């Protein structure tokens, strides 16, 4: 088990970790970064890409978010477009907006 897997196991617990253990390492790096975004704050796909050391991989970050098997636990709803637009969400944009509002994020529609 490598460092990223150990950190994800620590953050998610065994049951949730088992749901993601076979995904690509890139996805796991993205998801670990998402777990560090504080509730009530948002970041961009580009920011996440830069944080994981792949500054040109914003689209690949979006793909990792789309494949997130634990979309509320691993908070991909906290990632938005650089333009400030909400962007997509596997559970639907309405759900993403509701989650962000619940966390205190001001949403411009």
Residue ranges and their predicted role:
Residues 85-109:
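…primarily DNA-binding HTH/wHTH and HhH modules…
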Residues 1-56, 102-109:
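Basic nucleic-acid-binding alpha-helical/helix-turn surface characteristic of O6-alkylguanine DNA
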Residues 56-70:
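Regulatory, non-catalytic segments
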Residues 69-73, 86:
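Structural motif
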Residues 72-80:
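Short Lys/Arg-enriched helix C-cap and helix-to-coil transition segments
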């Amino acid at each position: 088990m490598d460092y990223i897997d150990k950190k994800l196991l620590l953050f998610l617990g065994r049951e949730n970790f088992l749901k993601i253990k076979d995904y690509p390492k890139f996805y796991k790096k993205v998801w670990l970064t998402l777990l560090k975004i504080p509730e009530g704050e948002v970041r961009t796909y580009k920011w996440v890409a830069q944080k994981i050391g792949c500054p040109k991989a914003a689209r690949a970050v979006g793909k990792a978010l789309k494949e997130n098997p634990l979309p509320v636990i691993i908070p991909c709803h906290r990632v938005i477009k650089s333009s400030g637009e909400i962007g997509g969400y596997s559970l639907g944009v309405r759900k993403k907006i509701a989650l962000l509002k619940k966390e205190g994020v001001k949403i411009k529609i």
